[in-house]
UniProtKB/Swiss-Prot annotation:
Residues spanning the signal sequence: 1-23
Reaction(s) catalysed by this chain's protein: glucuronate acceptor + UDP-alpha-D-glucuronate = acceptor beta-D-glucuronoside + UDP + H(+)
Transmembrane segments: 495-515
EC number: 2.4.1.17
Localization (cell): Membrane
Any Pfam family matching the protein: UDPGT
InterPro entries xref list: UDP-glycosyltransferase, UDP_glucos_trans, UDP_glycos_trans_CS
Residues on Cytoplasmic side: 516-530
Protein name according to UniProt: UDP-glucuronosyltransferase 2A3
Enzyme class: transferase
Length: 530
């Protein structure tokens, strides 16, 4: 860097520090895919506020390009697997989720999924081992004296790094399978009577049989995660720290939990003072479209356009499925912008244009956009909420069915089954969302709720990270439930004591009554004899 530019950068940093009153050092343990998009947005805001950000990233990561983010420092951790192997694992999972598992019986697909996640856990353990047992790296991190560590607990290890460095940390996530991390590590209440378990596709208004399903899912996830995930990490963390401990004991030390959802998206539920809901922090006003794309959008006239994307992970569909979708799109008067990298469908209509990539947020914010066809990823749904665009959902896996179930319940979306839908089903869903004004009205209502917050989600998230840096933690927000055993948490010891007291009182009264009755009989017999 030239001396003049370096001096300007230093001056800018000093001005930022003077404005905020504090310049901190932030260490980051990220997750990939859409998780990184949200975290990156927060980190960019922290850099704007004058903080120094260092991201720990693996040499085989697919989504974090450490050569394209000059605002961050990167510590690249060498691991034995390369990017090709990581990409193969990801593609294998997508193939299973999109094309294989939907054709299997539930028990068979569940068993296959279990085997896959057991392997993933072992791979993550290897990555963590390459991090915390890398003595030169850990020494460098200790010497850097970081003020806070921001981690995504979906990928364990960040909290272990924080524990070994003696640094307070902040968790950032949307959900964990079965809410197990939030419930058992964060002590967040999640009554299954009205809080839907993630991956169940349920809403907060459940019938009796849906509550049965929710309870079964809750118990199954608790058992599965404890048996196949937490057990592994409990042993790993104990070995790394040289003392008996558990994943939840370490993860539960998080000062603040930043949850990537909000009440425009989430159903009402209990939460704790150290849980902050920051959903939609990545959303922003639309920017002008590229010239060619803008011309295509304007050519739609009063009919407007439909935006179609299945996210960054699903790049291709089977030829049959692609033709089915293209056939439905060809029958609507709107122009369609479809993000798709596969072979051009034979049934593609003249109103539909394929793109390798689209500026999704900018398109959703365009005044001519009438509907959004989505797989139900939370980032895309939040952009639709932000701009007030109704949706047609085609969920594939993970939390996508849950997200779309919520949007359906709020009247802002129609859902079609990706595996069983016909061209007529998709066409009918599109016509409903576009022609029925209630869907647009409900989407705009959610948009108004999202925008009507006293503090923007991004500012709120950045504030709490800075708060932890300023105060060396947030222990005053930590509930005492972390210090209780499971039987104390559920007051089983108190209930047992009270039952013992009641039983003792009943026994005492019974004994007194029997004693009195026996004395009364003896007195009666004595009187008769006299």
């Amino acid at each position: 860097m030239a001396p003049g530019k370096l001096a300007s950068a230093v001056l800018l940093l000093l001005l930022c520090c003077a404005g905020s009153g504090f310049c901190g050092k932030v260490l980051v343990w990220p997750c990939e895919m859409s998780h990184w998009l949200n975290l990156k947005t927060l980190l960019e805001e922290l850099v704007k506020r004058g903080h120094e950000v260092t991201v720990l990233t693996l040499s085989n990561n697919l989504f974090i390009d450490y050569n394209r983010h000059p605002a961050f420092n990167f510590e690249v951790i060498p691991v034995p697997t390369d990017k090709n192997m990581s990409e193969n694992i990801l593609n294998e999972f997508i193939e299973l989720a999109v094309n294989v598992m939907p054709t299997m019986p539930l028990w068979q697909s569940g068993k296959l999924l279990q085997q896959f996640f057991v392997q993933i856990t072992e791979d993550l353990g290897l990555n963590c081992r390459n991090t915390v047992y890398n003595q030169s790296l850990m020494k460098k991190l200790r010497d850097s004296k970081y003020d806070v560590l921001v981690t995504d607990p979906v990928i364990p290890c960040g909290e272990l790094v924080a524990e070994m460095l003696g640094v307070p940390f902040v968790n950032m996530l949307k959900f964990s399978m079965g809410h197990t991390i939030e419930k058992y590590c964060g002590q967040l209440p999640a009554p299954p009577s009205y809080v839907p378990v993630p991956l169940g596709g349920l809403t907060t208004r459940m019938t009796f049989m849906e509550r049965v399903k929710n309870m079964v899912f809750s118990v199954l996830f608790d058992f599965w995660i404890q048996q196949y995930d937490y057990k592994f990490w409990d042993q790993f963390y104990s070995e790394a720290l040289g003392r008996p401990t558990t994943l939840c004991e370490i993860m539960g030390k998080a000062e603040i939990w930043l949850i990537r959802t909000y009440w425009d998206f989430e159903f009402p539920r209990p939460y704790l003072p150290n849980f902050e809901f920051v959903g939609g922090l990545h959303c922003k006003p639309a920017k002008p479209l590229p010239k060619e794309m803008e011309e295509f959008v304007q050519s739609s006239g009063e009919d407007g356009v439909v935006v179609f994307s299945l996210g960054s992970m699903v790049k291709n569909l089977t030829e049959e499925k692609a033709n089915l979708i293209a056939s439905a799109l060809a029958q609507i008067p709107q122009k369609v912008l479809w993000r798709y990298k596969g072979k051009k469908p034979a049934t593609l209509g003249p109103n539909t244009r394929l793109f390798d990539w689209i500026p999704q947020n900018d398109l959703l914010g365009h005044p001519k956009t009438k509907a959004f066809i989505t797989h139900g990823g939370s980032n895309g749904i939040y952009e639709a909420i932000y701009h007030g665009v109704p949706m047609v959902g085609m969920p594939i896996f993970s939390d996508q069915p849950d997200n779309l179930a919520g949007m359906k319940a709020k009247g802002a979306a129609v859902e079609v089954n990706m595996n069983t839908m016909t061209s007529a089903d998709l066409l009918g869903a599109l016509r409903t969302v576009i022609n029925d004004p209630t869907y647009k009205e409900n989407a705009m209502k959610l948009s108004r709720i999202h925008h009507d917050q006293p503090v923007k989600p991004l500012d709120r998230a950045a504030f709490w990270v800075e708060f932890v840096m300023h105060h060396k933690g947030a222990k005053h927000l930590r509930v005492a439930a972390h210090d209780l055993s499971w039987f104390q948490y559920h007051s089983l010891d108190v209930i047992g004591f009270l039952l013992a007291c009641v039983a003792s009182a009943i026994l005492l009264v019974t004994k007194c009554c029997l004693f009195s009755f026996q004395n009364f009989i003896k007195i009666g017999k004595r009187i008769k004899k006299e």
